[in-house]
Curated annotation (Swiss-Prot):
PPR repeat coordinates: 69-103, 104-139, 141-175, 176-210, 211-241, 247-281, 282-316, 317-347
Name the record gives this protein: Pentatricopeptide repeat-containing protein At1g11900
Keyword annotations of the record: Repeat
InterPro entries attached to this UniProt entry: Pentatricopeptide_rpt, TPR-like_helical_dom_sf
Family statement drawn from the similarity comment of this UniProt entry: Belongs to the PPR family. P subfamily.
NCBIfam families according to UniProt: PPR
Alphabetized Gene3D superfamilies for the sequence: Tetratricopeptide repeat domain
Length: 367
C-alpha cells in the first residue's frame, strides 16, 4: 500500500508553471462523486479523514474519465482556510501546483491573511513566497505586505523573515528591490520600527542592496516616529554608502523629522550641511528650516532665510508668513510683525505657494 506524503517542494524562482484553465480528469475507479459537495460530505461525516481525501484528489490526473473543476479545488482550499486548517490548505496548494494546477491568487491571499492573523510566521513566509512567483499575476497589493508584517507583531524572532528576505534578495526577480522596499514600508505601517532597521542592516550585506529610495523611506519612517538618534545614524550610514548619494529628498526628510521631534537646533545644522554639499534648498527645505528657527526663537536667521528664499524666486506660503509673524510677536518685535502682516495682505494669492506647490515638489522629486 502506497504511503501518502506531501510532494516535494517546488523551486521558488526560475520555474515555469503550465496552467490548466478549466477541467481535470479524475480516476474512473472512484465510486464517490467528484464534486465539491461530495468532498464536503466526506469531510463532515467523517467517512474519510482529510489526509485520505487529499490523497485521492491530488492523484486524480493520472487516469480516468470523471471530471472535477478548479472551482471545487478552490472551495476545498478555502474551506480548509476558514476552518483553521492552514497547513492542510497550504499542502493542498503545493500538491496541486506540482500537478500544474494553479488556483486563483485570491486563494493564496486569503491564506496569507489567515496566517498573518494567527501570527504564523513560518506559513506566512511560505505563502508570501508562493504569491510572489505566481504566473501571470498583477503586482501584489498592500494588503499582502501588511499581512506578512502582521505575522511578526508579537515576536522578536526574525529567523523566518530573514530567510525569506535573503532568498528574495538572491533571486532573479526583476522587481526584487521594489518588493524589499514595500516590505519595509509594511513593517513601518504595523509599527515594527526595530524590524525596519534590522532589514536595512541585513540588506547591506545581501546581494540586493538598499538604494536611495530605501534609505529615504527609512528616514521618513524614523522621522514620523520621532527617533532622532536613529535618523542621524541612518543618515551617517547613507553618506558612507558609496552606492547611493544623498539628495534633496534625503535632507528634506531629515529636516521634517527634526522639526516634528522639536529638535530645532539640529535643523540649521542639517540645512547648512545640505548647502555645503551643493544641494540647493527648495520650497520644502525653506519651509521646514524657517519654521524651526522661528519656533526656536532664532528670529534673525529665520528672517535672513526668508529673504534669501524670495531672492531665489521661491514663493513662500501663507504658513511661512504666519509662522514668522508669530515668532516676531513672541520676541516683542511688534513693528516688524505688523510690517510682515501688511506684506502678506498686499501679496497676491498667485504669488504665494499653495498646497498644490508642495505636492508638485514631492512628485517631481519622486520621479
Amino acid at each position: 500500500m502506497m504511503k501518502w506524503s506531501i510532494v516535494k517542494r517546488i523551486p521558488v524562482y526560475g520555474g515555469s508553471f503550465i496552467s490548466m484553465k478549466h477541467m481535470m480528469l479524475v480516476p474512473a475507479d472512484l465510486s464517490w462523486s467528484c464534486s465539491f459537495s461530495g468532498m464536503h460530505s466526506l469531510i463532515n461525516t467523517g467517512e474519510e479523514d482529510e489526509e485520505e481525501l487529499l490523497k485521492k484528489i491530488v492523484n486524480h490526473s493520472e487516469s480516468g474519465s470523471k471530471i472535477i473543476s478548479k472551482i471545487d479545488y478552490t472551495n476545498l482550499v478555502e474551506k480548509f482556510t476558514r476552518d483553521g486548517n492552514l497547513s492542510g490548505a497550504y499542502d493542498l496548494l503545493q500538491s496541486l501546483q506540482e500537478k500544474n494546477i494553479c488556483l486563483p491568487i485570491s486563494v493564496f491571499k486569503n491564506l496569507l491573511a489567515a496566517a498573518g492573523e494567527l501570527n504564523d510566521m513560518k506559513l506566512s513566509c511560505r505563502v508570501f513566497r508562493e504569491v510572489l512567483i505566481l504566473p501571470g499575476k498583477e503586482p501584489l497589493s498592500s494588503d499582502c505586505y501588511l499581512n506578512l508584517a502582521r505575522a511578526f507583531i508579537n515576536t522578536d524572532d526574525c529567523t523566518y523573515l530573514t530567510s525569506l528576505l535573503k532568498e528574495i534578495s538572491e533571486s532573479s526577480l526583476p522587481y526584487r528591490l521594489i518588493v524589499m522596499n514595500r516590505i519595509i514600508f509594511a513593517f513601518a505601517e504595523t509599527r515594527q520600527i526595530d524590524k525596519v532597521l534590522m532589514i536595512l542592516k541585513e540588506m547591506k550585506e545581501w546581494e540586493c542592496k538598499p538604494d536611495v529610495i530605501t534609505y529615504n523611506s527609512v528616514l521618513d519612517i524614523l522621522g514620523r516616529a520621532g527617533l532622532v538618534n536613529e535618523i542621524l545614524g541612518v543618515l551617517s550610514t547613507m553618506k558612507e554608502d558609496c552606492s547611493v548619494s544623498v539628495n534633496i529628498i534625503t535632507y528634506n526628510t531629515v529636516l521634517n523629522g527634526m522639526r516634528k521631534a522639536c529638535r530645532f537646533d539640529m535643523c540649521l545644522v542639517i540645512y547648512n550641511e545640505m548647502v555645503q554639499c551643493g544641494i540647493e534648498p527648495d520650497l520644502l527645505s525653506y519651509t521646514a528650516v524657517i519654521d524651526s528657527l522661528g519656533r526656536s526663537g532664532n528670529v534673525k536667521e529665520s528672517l535672513r532665510l526668508f529673504d534669501e528664499m524670495k531672492q531665489r524666486q521661491i514663493r513662500p506660503s501663507v504658513y511661512v508668513y504666519r509662522a514668522l509673524i508669530d515668532c516676531l510677536k513672541k520676541s516683542g518685535d511688534f513693528q516688524s510683525a505688523l510690517q510682515l502682516s501688511d506684506e502678506l495682505k498686499n501679496t497676491s494669492s498667485l504669488d504665494l505657494a499653495g498646497p498644490q506647490d508642495f505636492k508638485r515638489h514631492l512628485r517631481s522629486h519622486r520621479r
